[in-house]
UniProtKB/Swiss-Prot annotation:
pH-dependence annotation: Optimum pH is 8.5-9.
Name by which UniProt lists this protein: Ubiquitin carboxyl-terminal hydrolase 6
GO cellular component: proteasome complex; proteasome regulatory particle
Phosphoserine modifications at: S470
Positions of the Ubiquitin-like domain: 6-80
Keyword Protease among UniProt keywords: yes
Enzyme Commission number(s) from the entry: 3.4.19.12
Regulation: Activated by it's association with the proteasome.
InterPro entries per UniProt: Papain-like_cys_pep_sf (IPR038765), Peptidase_C19_UCH (IPR001394), Ubiquitin-like_dom (IPR000626), Ubiquitin-like_domsf (IPR029071), UBP14-like (IPR044635), USP_CS (IPR018200), USP_dom (IPR028889)
Taxonomic lineage: Eukaryota, Fungi, Dikarya, Ascomycota, Saccharomycotina
Free-text comment about domains: The N-terminal ubiquitin-like domain is required for proteasome association and UBP6 activation at the proteasome.
Record family assignment: Belongs to the peptidase C19 family. USP14/UBP6 subfamily.
Active site positions, chain numbering: C118, H447
Disordered: region residues: 365-391
Amino acid sequence: MSGETFEFNIRHSGKVYPITLSTDATSADLKSKAEELTQVPSARQKYMVKGGLSGEESIKIYPLIKPGSTVMLLGTPDANLISKPAKKNNFIEDLAPEQQVQQFAQLPVGFKNMGNTCYLNATLQALYRVNDLRDMILNYNPSQGVSNSGAQDEEIHKQIVIEMKRCFENLQNKSFKSVLPIVLLNTLRKCYPQFAERDSQGGFYKQQDAEELFTQLFHSMSIVFGDKFSEDFRIQFKTTIKDTANDNDITVKENESDSKLQCHISGTTNFMRNGLLEGLNEKIEKRSDLTGANSIYSVEKKISRLPKFLTVQYVRFFWKRSTNKKSKILRKVVFPFQLDVADMLTPEYAAEKVKVRDELRKVEKEKNEKEREIKRRKFDPSSSENVMTPREQYETQVALNESEKDQWLEEYKKHFPPNLEKGENPSCVYNLIGVITHQGANSESGHYQAFIRDELDENKWYKFNDDKVSVVEKEKIESLAGGGESDSALILMYKGFGL
């Protein structure tokens, strides 16, 4: 390929510059060309390229740089150099890391509160974080029709998805400082009248239950998208119903399904796992078909299919007759950032998933070691060549995260079972990606918020308080377990490990 040319891009300070060079070009040629385009002196240029370009000037850049690729360039342009002040001032560099992120990163966009609509805003943010669902809605073409569900009033469900698409487009494009989902809200109230309930005295719209909205939106999307949507969330159970007083009275149901797991909260529930197991193993009283008398039955559910995305609902609200409202269980119930549900599966299914889990854990260990190694590699601050502004540090981290994300996903994928169903989790492990919280004493008052994990940085989370969006530390998420009327986890969104 000697003597031929190839094209690629360099990205610097948010701008992309196309470059054409000979396949024989050296790093010195690249730096000279980049200096013309960006005004970053050659000596200050740093390239995010595997193998590096900061050594000998005679290093050939092809095939270190692939044709059509985009390479991140770091370095301060000559015109923007500012000498260090003699005395300390309050510059960006003096801010805490999370404050620097908020200065340089384009924060996600929030939703305007239209009067007791925080339940809608928090739910939409959580759904938007589910990338497969987000893409499905953004790519929705109304002319493609709806599923063959046979549901009545399919057109109104189609309209809900269309309005969700408009909202998601605004979140994605960041066209406005905040999004006003008024048309979606009106469509929801038309389809589901409970969300149009007004206060009998003030006449204003009442606060609603975010979990109820979550369920109804799932219903609408199931009607519009059918299995294409449902498979990513469908949990399948093998249910055994047994009369505790008669060993011969046993019923087994193989294919029961749901779109979420419930975490039951009793006076002894301290951890989410206990609440989930309690929800899968219950006692009920019913009439026996064999004896004709009422009897106590044990209902044991074992999971026989795990979805790509797992939704967990904390059953915090219960109907209180004395107040005629859904009151809230304030108990603290700790949830994990990584959830392993191996002990909730049928024995055969567990054996398959545990085998894959162990292989994925090896990849995760290697990934964590590489990340620790990268963090240890710091640029020498005493060298003018290696001076990095906070903006460059931020861009460096983003570039590293983006470049490595696909690589590790491919590594995980190598260990997926060949018979994996569409929308199925390859293992029995999930990572937390979002939490919808409630603040207050009952579902008809208080405030809902969403806490969403960054798609590239697992340690960075965003707090969505309607249209006010901020970055929070991972430690803040741990405090959402409850224990009072402050933010308490209500709905948790998990994504399959390695996906």
